[in-house]
Amino acid sequence: MDPVAHQNVFPRDTLITPLIMMINNGVPVSTFIDVGAADGTFALTVLDAVNPSLRLLNIDAQETYAPSLARIEALLGEPYRITAVGEHDGTLRVNRPKHEYWLSTASHMGATGDTFELPCRKLDSLCAEVGVEGPCFIKLDVEGAEMGVLKGAEETLRDTCGLLIESPVRAAPGPQFLDIYAFLAARDFSLFDMVRLSHRGSDATLYQFYAVFIANRFDFRGRAPLRTKAQQAEVLAAVTERREHLRAEIPQMIASIKLKRAMVRTGDG
């Protein structure tokens, strides 16, 4: 199925659509690695909708997800690990979250005073232990701990074709999207897409989105023109029509502005 046809099943802004586009354009994926897998449903969606032959590695830090991930392993033979993922092998202490979805191993995410210890593994160590075969596509949903995971995945990234990363936009301390971008750009990845923009409920400002990266050696963009001839003709017609519409609105907008300025001067506005 081609990328346009897939959009009938998965709209353009879904988390799975960029992966579909990559695969449909010849990007090879052997293993899907989900760091922050929760109950494993996203990886199941990838297998069900994209390629049932993909290998999986589900990873989550919390025991509460073990029964779901163990069931996937028992029925499909796809391994899982219950461990935090970071830049060292050992343990770390984390703050207990208000909901299991929001567990973060990142120290900058704030202290609650209620902490507990978790095992911690580098992604490189886990992939070697499981025997992961590349090229890999990696999903990271780790609540602010993205840089730690990436720093412990140097070897894995060398055999990775793409990544889907929940990316923060923060005013508070901690890594930003630009830090993630710079780290991956230095390792020959390019930004491929951005989906699922999320906005703060209090003031509607952007606080996170999912960034998609592609390994430069697999980047297919540029092989085809920006648009087909038919699409280009449609765009030209649309922008011509839009300009005429905007020009027609100029007198009304000027009149409205003059009226509002007059009201301000007289104290009525």
Where are these regions (language model features)?
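Phosphate/nucleotide-binding beta-alpha loop and adjacent structural elements of enzyme active sites
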Residues: 1-269
